[in-house]
Swiss-Prot record:
UniProt gene name: proA
A GO term, aspect molecular function: glutamate-5-semialdehyde dehydrogenase activity
Protein's organism: Clostridium perfringens (strain ATCC 13124 / DSM 756 / JCM 1290 / NCIMB 6125 / NCTC 8237 / Type A)
Keywords, in A-Z order: Amino-acid biosynthesis, Cytoplasm, NADP, Oxidoreductase, Proline biosynthesis
Record field: catalytic activity: L-glutamate 5-semialdehyde + phosphate + NADP(+) = L-glutamyl 5-phosphate + NADPH + H(+)
Protein name as annotated: Gamma-glutamyl phosphate reductase
One biological process term in Gene Ontology: L-proline biosynthetic process
Cellular compartments annotated: Cytoplasm
Entries under CDD domains matching the protein: ALDH_F18-19_ProA-GPR
Database matches in InterPro entries: Ald_DH/histidinol_DH, Ald_DH_C, Ald_DH_N, Aldehyde_DH_dom, G-glutamylP_reductase_CS, Glu-5-SA_DH, GPR_dom
GO cellular component: cytoplasm
């Protein structure tokens, strides 16, 4: 076991105990100092981010992934503002969600408490570093971060700034830490740090999620993989459908709630596909379609079986013509990742059937999948989008970073 992990694990465990009973004011003060420090030291962050970008460009990283990695003054301000916004959110810690009285006079309550020490393993998104730190701090959790090697310089600087701010706020050392060793061996050891981690949350592509699920002995909450579909029903509004798929695919193609597949009912395909594909190509999207799609719009690439299950995270879209709603639902439930799925239709019964039968964390009617986000749902910031069913599902905000403690009041009862 890597010695860095043991040292940081012990520090995090100690910090989590103190954080568990820190007052809301103390935690909010720490968050405000973090936000202020990120803005004050923006130039330091950008200098380190420049190093990461130069290395990524040398490696031939895609433009979409470079966009996730890149920071500028506005993005740093946005990160700082997101931290400050967490101050405005209600503190769930200590909340008694229910209280009931037993026939023997015992009063039993359910209270929200921190999870303890949260491990987060993620890829090339420096904003996750600050977001995760803020959410964990607000909920009284210590956090150990393991970012991708692509963003190591940016992440180290952000955590340095956060640590300095927490020290100034008199919050415990070890509340927010990051692993400097980004090797796979250390990552695997991190996934097995049961003595110190209470939960592990991976954020990234399918490869990362699979590696964590296969190797972790620490309890895992899966997040992020989004093979999201837009289904155009035979009773869809054509213009609405085009607007939705263009937005869902191109607004930020490298995020998990971007659309990766377009399914089109055969009754509307000849009218819809030429318009939609033209609009998508104007945005630089490569189309990989089924044979029926190619028969309607010839100037595309043929999709393979592998395409239907793939999360591209790029300007690529798989397109398939389906017989009807039932085939669309069957296809989504077979190839989807239980993230976000959408139907475009004017038919109420078709929309209700889609909502009921599609198995996903977020299911939409006549809207882009890009709204699957804690902020857009009104929850505030999020730690990720859970695609599993146990502990949390969908956008994970503050409440999802808590667990229950039963508190029992008696007056001498014995059994």
């Amino acid at each position: 076991m890597n010695n860095e992990l043991i040292i940081k694990g012990k520090k995090a465990k100690e910090a989590s105990y103190t954080l568990s009973f820190a007052s809301t004011n103390e935690k909010n003060n720490g968050l405000l100092k973090i936000s202020e420090s990120l803005i004050k030291r923006c130039d330091e962050i950008l200098e380190e981010n420049k190093k990461d970008l130069e290395k990524a460009i040398e490696k031939g990283t895609s433009n979409a992934m470079l966009d996730r990695l890149k920071l500028d003054e506005e993005r740093v301000k946005s990160i700082a503002n997101a931290v400050a916004d967490v101050v405005k959110l209600d503190d769930p810690i200590g909340e008694v969600t229910s209280m009931f009285k037993r026939p023997n006079g015992l009063r039993i309550g359910v209270q929200r408490v921190p999870l303890g020490v949260v491990g987060i393993i993620y890829e090339a998104r420096p904003n996750v570093t600050a977001d995760a730190a803020a959410l964990c701090l607000k909920t009284g959790n210590a956090v150990i971060l393991r970012g991708g090697s692509e963003a190591i310089n940016s992440n180290l600087k952000i955590v340095e700034i956060i640590s300095d701010a927490l020290k100034e706020a008199s919050l415990p050392e070890g509340s927010v830490q990051i692993l400097e060793d980004t090797s796979r061996e250390t990552a695997t050891d991190f996934m097995r740090l049961n003595d110190y981690l209470d939960v592990l949350i991976p954020r990234g592509g399918a490869g990362l999620i699979k590696a964590v699920v296969n190797n972790a002995t620490v309890p895992v909450i899966e997040t992020g993989v989004g093979n999201c579909h837009i289904y155009i029903d035979d009773e869809a509004d054509i213009n609405m459908g085009v607007d939705i798929i263009v937005n869902a695919k191109t607004s930020r193609p490298a995020v998990c709630n971007a659309a990766e597949k377009l399914l089109v009912n055969e009754k509307i395909a000849e009218e819809f596909l030429p318009v939609a594909i033209k609009a998508l190509k104007e945005k630089g999207v490569e189309i990989r379609g089924c044979e029926k799609t190619k028969a309607i719009v010839n100037d595309i690439n043929l999709a393979t079986e592998e395409d239907w299950g793939k999360e591209y995270l790029d300007y690529i879209l798989g397109v398939k013509v389906v017989k009807d709603l039932d085939e669309a639902i069957s296809h989504i439930n077979k190839y989807g990742t239980k993230h976000s799925e959408s139907i475009v239709t004017k038919n109420y019964f078709n929309s209700e059937k889609f909502l009921q039968r599609v198995d996903a964390a977020a299911v939409y009617v006549n809207a882009s999948t890009r709204f699957t986000d804690g902020g857009e749902f009104g929850f505030g910031a999020e730690i990720g989008i859970s695609t599993q069913k146990l502990h949390a599902r969908g956008p994970m905000g503050l409440k999802e970073l808590t667990t229950n403690k039963y508190i029992i009041y008696g007056n001498g009862q014995i059994r």
